[in-house]
Amino acid sequence: MLPDAAVINQAAVATIVLSGIALLIGVYFIRQNQRESHMRAMLTASVLATLFLVLYLTRLALGYEKSFAGPAEWKPAYLVLLLSHIAMAAANLPLALVALWYTYKGMRAAGSLQNIDAVPAARRAFDQHRRWVRWTVPVWLYVAVTGWVIYLILGRWGTVMTR
């Protein structure tokens, strides 16, 4: 059972790394006013983040966990990092869902990316989307980066726990 869970863990790490990269690419594209490329990058980031969540929960269900086994004086810092990661990850899911909802509303009203600015309901929805992602993107990046750091820490100072 554990080797399968370990493979799932590696796949989960790969998906969240790729999700973070796709997120950054999406931010770049929207700053270049490349809406279609932005949309594709963000959908990719969202799908990869969803896949990560499924893999992560599967790994936990299989009983594969790691705990910090490093120097005792570093444990408080590790726990602060871990708790902030967990809290921000919990906040990120609803933030991302609301941002996606406004995207859906805007696209439904506009009919296509080219009509976003011409259809008032679409413009309002995308203005709301923009307001939400100003919070969502930094939280998402924080969660991704702290997740990678936690993974690296546990790779060096982690011990596998089984249930």
Residue ranges, per PLM feature:
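Alpha-helical membrane insertion/targeting regions
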Residues: M1-R163
